[in-house]
Amino acid sequence: MRKLLWKIPRDYYRCNQCFGFTLIPKLSPEELNELYSDYYLEDSSNMEAFTDGCSDNWIKKYKLTINYFRTQKLDSKNFLDFGCGVDGYGLQVAKENGLTVSGLEVSAKTRAILRANTNCRIFSPDELQVSSELFDFILLSDVLEHATSPSLILEQAIQHLAENGVLLIQGPLEGTNNFTNLFLRIYSYLTPAKVADFLPYHVSLANQKSIQSLLKTNGLKIEKIRITETWWPAPKTLSSFRALPKVLPQIIAKLLDFSVSYLLPNYGSRFWLVASKNSK
């Protein structure tokens, strides 16, 4: 994969066992605080815009979770959105399905916005750490790819999972073998002098094998898993015709990925799963 330059040169290294990728050198706590600043807070403090924006977006992003909730008895069950983000979609989905809802968020500003917009209890990491409360459902939606240690995140979540509770986990499979990543590897090979300068929000790039290995290592068993294809990260619009030579191969690669995903059920760049504690 292409070298990334953010403050210092960094590379994504592949694990020889699970074939997932990790960004090395890892981000320091100070760099993480800088990275996740007010960027995620733009246009999210307006209650009317927040409410209007949720309806369509949460249905698209949380369709599988919504369908899963419809098969469960949710009376008197509680729910924790572990790393809910400023949009609060996961909180809204759980509230719509009658669950008693709480969230966890690192940023104090984000917590304040979420409390105002959702009327939910939002923990800070320190508050959750000292809490003895257990949850029937814990959601990690697009969280693990941001973590320098996904295993540590899972450990923290499991500490607050009820005995018969389940984890609902979803996110991208950026380390999978597909046409999109093949195009990116070829492009990197043909342009070795170029260095990526995007902000490293995603530092752990998973594939299906690495996700399964991560859960097994942390004493979890997968009850359900769905692999799907999404348009991301291919561009949705063309900024200029000069960009066409680069954009067109990406679009073609993504169309090929969609075509294969219709034929192979475990082919795709996004996962959703339900996991529980392994009693064995």
Regions found by a protein language model. Give the residues of each.
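S-adenosyl-L-methionine-dependent methyltransferase catalytic module, highlighting the catalytic core
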Residues: L140, T148-Q159, V166-S276
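Conserved N-terminal segment of class I S-adenosyl-L-methionine
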Residues: M1-S141, P150-L154, Q170, I227-T228, ...
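Generic low-complexity, intrinsically disordered sequence content enriched
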Residues: Y68, K95, G165, N218-G219
